[in-house]
Regions:
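Gram-negative outer-membrane beta-barrel transporters
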Residues: 362-365, 428-434, 443, 553-649, ...
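Transmembrane beta-barrel wall of Gram-negative outer-membrane proteins
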Residues: 155-157, 162-191, 200-239, 263-274, ...
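Membrane-embedded beta-barrel scaffold of Gram-negative outer-membrane proteins
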Residues: 274-278, 283-301, 482-492, 507-597, ...
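N-terminal periplasmic "start-of-domain" segments of outer-membrane beta-barrel proteins
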Residues: 20-50, 75-78
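Structural signature of Gram-negative outer-membrane beta-barrels, strongest in the C-terminal barrel
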Residues: 350, 362-377, 403-533, 573, ...
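C-terminal beta-signal and adjacent terminal beta-strands/loops
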Residues: 534, 641-648, 665-715
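Short acidic/polar hinge/loop motifs at secondary-structure boundaries
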Residues: 99-127
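Extracytoplasmic beta-strand/coil segments of soluble accessory domains associated
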Residues: 60-99
């Protein structure tokens, strides 16, 4: 990539660089107060303080956002906003530069792909009625990740990090303008050997991830046309299999020997063409995009032991049995009983392409915006099996074909089409601003399935193809009132939805009341929110761990969610030019089922009215305190505490997740105007808590105490 940067620097004359704004849905921190609802902007300066590569940690600075750690690196995040289902972030609208980024936002929204956080320039989060413009999921909100923008003048950056467990991260970009043309080349490489050990057999548990991005822009007067291309690859030795509670108590950073062959292979490419400009009194942004993504997660599916050892075959059942005290189940996990282990290629190809535009204009007291999106996406599966033999001494054989009947299962092709539009009118009446919004969604899907066990997808199941469709219209309004130059009241209501196929959409009525205060170097926001679900819906996934078929939808009935969000920041000026920035984020949440039911353990299990919604903590707190000196030395200490939650509504033994926390430290020194060096320590106290019991009901701990050092060169 160094050669590419050199070529770019030859083409563009070097100058001091400032960056051109990318496509955003909010803008700057100052633009948040213009929202008819709650929102947050985390700037590039915010992200630079900790140099995080885990989106979970970045979002800890945003109230109302919850997360469930899985691999310790944030490779496949689980994010919830204001109580939405957390599994694979499927109920949050995810975007990069304003374009939907989930592998297949309608067909399969689960975020097995998530943009590489280390290359992201800034982050926007929308909640409340403000999110009605950013479907398809509008109950909780939307997250927009802003990629590195093209600099106005020629400039670049080179970042190099080294850390424990063989961690190496390289991030470099260069770009600029020459006449009407601008361009940017960016490379991000990140790898580590991982922090978990594999019992009996050893091996790495890390990843190797690479992104290459190119942008080009042509500008003429008030018009610009931007081409963006991205290619990404990932290989990660990650497993779905967590630990039984007994194993966790002995060594929380262990992987079972049977997971030796577990590996995720990802690759994909993205391309978008975006027009932005003014035509008369109209501001127009229009984008055409095409995203292709492939992933094959080869991982333990079953331990074929029912006849020999009397334990159900599914790995989720084995862990559950071990948690229930079954000695044979624990022995299988420990590699002390001989079993045949079956692994499945969770092999999927995704497409996501479409066109969208937004037109804005002002007429008197009205600021009108109209948006439209027409898109199609798909998910194609072909899932083959392979097997190996685990001996009673914990030694694994080589992989071999499982034989007849294990060629493949759940092989399918799902293709969806969707159109949506929204209309928004912001009416300004002096200190009062009222925003009224309307959104409409129309979507349909065709699904084909092939018979299990066939070597190729040649024998179409007699029950297919099947066609499913749905539509939904929603309205919302928000209002802001400026009490004075420093204080603003906010109120809003909106009907939210999440598209579902084969059943009615998930719907909820949502309201919020808030207060914003800003004066000098102090800011404070307090919001109360409430979501009344008519029907909480969830689609079965492999990561969820229920006894259900992947893709089936389960109705959780009425659910009540309410809470309080607080965020504040201030800068205290000290002596000798030293300042002390302090930030606080707090969320208190009550999310409970309103009805009692039992789905025979397929997804929700046994639910009693008043049970908590899984993985929504009762509270979350993030406190950041730092210092900035006049000689270029700065530092930040971050303490994040997540309250207790449960992995299931019934919250039985070994299904609780107690309150847990971590502390991160970052020290930075500017050697001159162009060179910074820094040091970071994650999980400073090396806490070893249960932070999740998924995927597959297994207990998981947070990343251990880990140190890294790095430098950043601006040129």
């Amino acid at each position: 990539f160094i050669g590419v940067l050199i070529v770019s620097s030859f083409v563009l004359n070097a100058e001091e660089g400032t960056e051109v704004e990318s496509v955003t849905i909010i803008g700057t921190k100052d633009d948040v107060k213009e929202l008819a609802g709650s929102g947050s902007v985390l700037s590039n300066a915010d992200l630079k303080k900790q140099m995080d590569t885990d989106i979970h940690k970045i979002l800890s600075a945003v109230p109302g956002v919850y997360f469930r750690t899985e691999d310790g690196y944030g490779l496949r995040p689980n994010i919830s906003i204001r109580g939405t289902s957390i599994d694979r972030s499927a109920k949050v609208t995810l975007m990069e530069d304003g374009i939907l980024i989930a592998p297949a936002p309608y067909t399969s929204a689960s975020a097995y792909y998530f943009p590489t956080t280390g290359r992201i320039n800034s982050v926007e989060v929308l909640k409340g009625p403000a999110s009605i413009s950013q479907g398809p999921s509008t109950i909780g909100g939307a997250i927009n990740l802003i990629s590195t923008p093209i600099p106005e003048a020629n400039s670049g950056k080179f970042i190099q990090e080294l850390g424990q467990n063989g961690m190496v991260r390289t991030h470099a970009y260069y770009g600029g303008n020459s006449g009407n043309l601008g361009a940017l080349v960016e490379v991000h490489e990140h790898q580590t050997d991982g922090f978990d050990g594999i019992a009996n057999v050893g091996g790495d548990t890390g990843f190797n991830k690479s992104d290459v991005m190119f942008k080009a822009r042509y500008e003429s007067g008030n018009h610009s046309l931007t081409l963006k291309m991205l290619e990404m690859n990932e290989k990660s030795e990650q497993s779905y299999v967590g630990l039984s509670q007994a194993s966790f108590n002995k060594n929380p950073r262990l992987r079972y020997g049977m997971t030796q062959y577990d590996v995720m292979d990802n690759d994909g490419d993205q391309m978008s063409l975006t027009y932005a400009g003014s035509i008369g009194n109209f501001d127009v942004v229009a984008s055409k995009w095409s995203n292709d993504y492939h992933r094959d997660w080869f991982k333990v599916d079953k331990a074929n032991n029912t006849k020999a050892h009397g334990v159900s075959n599914g790995i989720n059942s084995v862990i559950s049995a071990a948690n229930g005290g079954n000695a044979n189940a624990q022995a299988i996990l420990d590699g002390k009983l001989a079993v045949q282990v079956k692994l499945k290629h969770n092999n999927r190809f995704y497409t996501n392409e479409g066109f969208q535009f937004k037109v804005s204009t002002e007429v008197g007291m009205h600021a009108l915006t109209v948006g439209y999106r027409d898109m199609e996406d798909s998910e194609s599966r072909y899932q083959e099996y392979e097997c190996f033999d685990q001996s009673a001494s914990g030694v694994n054989s080589a992989l071999y074909s499982c034989g007849t009947g294990y060629t493949g299962s759940n092989n399918r092709l799902r293709e969806s089409e969707a159109t949506s539009y929204y209309i928004e009118d912001k009416i300004t009446l002096g200190k009062l601003a009222i925003t009224i919004g309307h959104r409409s969604e129309d979507y349909d899907q065709v699904e084909n399935r092939w018979d299990d066990g066939t070597p190729t997808r040649t024998q179409l199941n007699s029950s297919y193809p099947k066609t499913k469709d749905g539509d939904y219209t929603s309205t919302g309004f928000g209002a802001t009132y400026d009490l004075n130059a420093n204080m603003q009241l906010v109120a809003g209501f909106h009907e939210g939805m999440t598209a579902m196929f084969g059943t009615d959409p998930e719907t909820a009525d949502n309201m919020e009341l808030g207060l914003r205060y800003s004066e000098g170097m102090s800011d404070l926001e307090v919001f109360y929110f409430q979501s009344d679900y008519e029907s909480l819906k969830a689609a079965c996934t492999n990561s969820q761990g229920g006894a259900c078929d992947d893709g089936d939808v389960f109705d959780g009935g009425a659910v009540d969610v309410s809470g309080v969000e607080v965020s504040g920041s201030m800068i205290v000026e000290g002596d000798n030019g030293t300042s002390y920035p302090i930030g606080l984020t707090y969320t208190s949440t009550d999310a409970t089922f309103a009805n009692s039911f039992d789905d025979d353990g397929e997804y929700w299990g046994v639910v009693a009215a008043g049970d908590d919604v899984p993985y929504v903590p009762d509270s979350s707190l993030a406190l950041v305190a730092g210092f900035v000196t006049s000689n270029g030395l700065s530092g930040n200490l971050r303490w994040v505490k997540n309250g207790s939650s449960c992995s299931t509504a019934s919250c039985g033994i070994n299904q609780t997740i107690d309150a847990h926390s971590f502390i991160d430290l970052n020290i930075r020194k500017a050697l001159n105007e162009n060179v910074d060096i820094y040091m970071g320590v994650e999980n400073l106290l090396d806490d070893e808590d249960v932070v999740a019991r998924a995927p597959k009901d297994g207990a998981r701990s947070q990343k251990p105490r880990t140190m890294k050092v790095g430098f950043a060169l601006n040129f």
